[in-house]
């Protein structure tokens, strides 16, 4: 809602060109933003407390079509921290990514950019893995409070796009009871 955007503008995603997204667009939010996650968890918890034991509720859908990453400095820092945890040292990262080959060697974690289209294959793969882990943790943040407050017979899913390769669907689906896919017939994209 507009009040949320106005009160918490930091929860808007930063596009690849560096511009902040505007209110009113689809997927205008930053999945990695702590405030956004806190608010989503609060809504999920309240809904689960209210409807979690309702016999007419058969399941829960966390979200719809993860697809829009944020490219701001906050996400870049989270990515760099993720890389530190994964590789331990820059020497290890540089060796694993073969950065010496094209003079791409990093000497400080802050030098590592966000890149998803061109560049070092190790960087591209690591970004995709980071995005997968980010979506999974965003989802698990809500999944945990739903599970704690709902009937165990209610399934939990999220809706994914089978043709979208911006993340690893298997990683994102690990904590779900089932993975869902939508096919929007009539939109022309399958012609």
Regions from the PLM with identified roles:
Residues 6-178, 182-187:
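Polysaccharide-binding and catalytic clefts of secreted carbohydrate-active enzymes
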């Amino acid at each position: 809602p507009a009040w949320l955007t106005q009160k918490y503008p930091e929860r808007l995603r930063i596009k690849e060109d560096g511009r902040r997204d505007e209110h009113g667009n689809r997927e205008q939010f930053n999945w990695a933003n702590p405030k956004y996650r806190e608010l989503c968890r609060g809504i999920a918890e309240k809904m689960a407390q209210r409807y979690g034991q309702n016999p007419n509720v058969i399941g829960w859908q966390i979200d719809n079509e993860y697809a829009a990453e944020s490219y701001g400095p906050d996400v870049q820092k989270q990515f760099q921290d993720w890389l530190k945890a994964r590789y331990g040292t820059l020497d290890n990262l540089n060796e694993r990514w073969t950065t010496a080959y094209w003079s791409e060697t990093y000497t400080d974690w802050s030098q590592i950019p966000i890149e998803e289209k061109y560049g070092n294959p190790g960087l591209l793969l690591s970004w995709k893995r980071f995005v997968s882990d980010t979506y999974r943790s965003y989802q698990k943040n809500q999944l945990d409070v739903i599970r704690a407050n709902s009937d165990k017979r209610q399934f939990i899913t999220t809706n994914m796009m089978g043709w979208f390769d911006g993340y690893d669907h298997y990683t994102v689906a690990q904590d779900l009871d089932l993975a869902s896919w939508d096919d929007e017939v009539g939109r022309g994209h399958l012609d």
